[in-house]
Amino acid sequence: FDVDGDGWTDSAYTWPLWGIVIDPDGVSTKPEPINIKKESDPINSFALDVGIPLLRDGPISLDFYAQYASLLGKTTNPLDTTKRENVGYGLIPLGLSAKLGPAHFTFEFRMVPDGKFQFGYFNRSYEVERATFQSISGNQGTIITKASKLGRFGKQNGFFSGLNINLGSIFDVGFSYQNLKGEQFDPSKNEFEKADNQSFTAILKLAKPISKIDRASWFYQQRNVPNPFDFEYSESTITGYNASLKLGNGMVLTYIFRRTFQDFNGDGD
């Protein structure tokens, strides 16, 4: 054995009459591996929606809707990291969805009354954000989950808007933007302070097949940052494209590209 990983086997320092004695060279032993079963941090969500049609006139329509959305799980209190608290909920008391020919517009007033919540928690970048490994002292590490970071979000209010347009029955283009204002935890000051929480998503896709191209799409997403139009990459940034080509005889070749960014030290940058 070489439990401390220094290259010297423990057998060289073993006394048969007394059992195994770890080599006394002063080198600290390797840390215990992370047990993902003990370190699990489950989270779930559910939502309740209600909608009322307000207008129907040929290609024109207008609908009103409202939503209550809640996350189910625990998060860490940033003011006292030994405390675990229930995650929060979000409200959309006013939502409008309008269609005018090829254009579809949505507008929502959003509220997070008690913080510890994100709209669109399970988004495209969730697989990257859901767990980050952070190195700590003593040659050890810990797992920082996305759920544990929800505690840094305080009370917030703002709006969400989205626009989808069919361009000449060939392309579909979509944009969405969220702007929430409220409180976020600043670790450098160890307190909550006023901050902007903005998100932006853009999508361009082929509306119908063209020749050998069966499907094609491109997207860009950045969520929960002070200003997504600065285009400063974070873990919530993801971009990529999909392309499918018909090869004949029922075969389709699909190429998928994703570009993501990972926070190696868990500091949020």
Give the ranges of each region predicted by the language model.
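C-terminal scaffolding/assembly regions of large eukaryotic complex subunits
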Residues: 256-258
